[in-house]
Amino acid sequence: MEVKTFAFLQIAVLIAFSLHSASAGSKQPGAAGSSSDSVEAVFCPTNCTKGTNGAWSGCSDDCICVHVGENTEGSCMKFSGDYDYPTPEA
């Protein structure tokens, strides 16, 4: 009985250690905002609306429309930095 309990505890510790090691990774902490691939998002002064044809309008060329769920109104935002945001084809 003691051998089975001891073996079970060894396996449990091994699994816990393995999960922690896998999730911790090897990333070193850095200063806030020091990431080389950080993105800055700023609200533009305009809002956007969804038309009857399903197209969004109201944002300038350098801003995109962001909305929540099925809302037909949204806010325009401008992103700057290293990001790969897909542009919808018109």
Curated annotation (Swiss-Prot):
Annotated disulfide bonds: 44-63, 48-65, 59-76
Keyword Signal: yes
Alphabetic keyword roster: Disulfide bond, Glycoprotein, Secreted, Signal
First and last residue of the signal peptide: 1-24
Any one Gene Ontology cellular component term annotated for this protein: extracellular region
UniProt superkingdom: Eukaryota
Molecular function GO labels: C-X-C chemokine binding
Residue positions the entry lists as glycosylated: 47
Role summary: Salivary chemokine-binding protein which binds to host chemokines CXCL1, CXCL2, CXCL3, CXCL5, CXCL6 and CXCL13.
Protein name: Evasin P458
Organism this protein belongs to: Ixodes ricinus
Lineage: Eukaryota, Metazoa, Ecdysozoa, Arthropoda, Chelicerata
